Amino acid sequence: MESLIQTYLPNVYKMGWAGQAGWGTAIYLTLYMTVLSFIIGGFLGLVAGLFLVLTAPGGVLENKVVFWILDKITSIFRAVPFIILLAVLSPFSHLIVGTSIGPNAAIVPLSFAVFAFFARQVQVVLAELDGGVIEAAQASGATFWDIVGVYLSEGLPDLIRVTTVTLISLVGETAMAGAVGAGGIGNVAIAYGFNRYNHDVTILATIIIILIIFAIQFLGDFLTKKLSHKS
């Protein structure tokens, strides 16, 4: 097997598994940036999406000022292409993590991108829930946190679905960040593949990204179906 790789994928073989330019390191950095960015941006996006619904006209906590601010912040970050967001937030990344390059620096703009995208997805999901369920909870004297629980439990299957979409989008943005210095599979594909005309490296990097996305999609579909059947 090793001899076959060495013969037909010589550049892939030369890179090895470990080390700064190894495949294992690249995969780890891609997953590291994806997971950490989603934890940070996903949490903020969930909270923002929830409050976009709660403070909207006719919402449980109707508040035009809060809704307007959240709506505009989300729209601004959604409107800026990610490659530009990387450049714009570079000074902020340096302020937060002490550097403007590398995986830790990339997590800052990635988190902002996830926040805006996921907030809109959550808003759409929760806004489409049956209003009668929320009204029934209010009529029974439910507290604020009880109502939040109703929103999240009723919308859980669709929240899993939009989480899947967000993660898939994030993997692509992580690869884009890698191409401009953050490391990971994107960096391997461009720096060690495309720029050096090592087509086997570029192709394998692409296949790895596709496999990661397929894995996320499979898990997301599985959880969505399972939770939908329970509900």
Give the location of each predicted region.
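Transmembrane alpha-helix signature in integral membrane proteins
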Residues: 23-54, 163
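Periplasmic/extracellular loop-to-transmembrane helix junction in inner-membrane transport proteins
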Residues: 1-37, 63-68, 151
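Transmembrane alpha-helices
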Residues: 144-176
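Loop-to-helix entry region at the N-terminal start of transmembrane alpha-helices
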Residues: 25-33, 75-78, 82-117, 201, ...
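Short helix-to-coil transition segments within interhelical loops
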Residues: 126-155, 195
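C-terminal transmembrane helix and the adjacent membrane-cytosol boundary/short C-terminal tail
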Residues: 51-57, 203-231
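Cytoplasmic-entry segments and transmembrane alpha-helices of multi-pass inner-membrane transporters
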Residues: 51-89, 110, 117-124
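Glycine-rich helix-loop "coupling/hinge" segments at transmembrane-helix boundaries
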Residues: 173-203, 207-208, 228
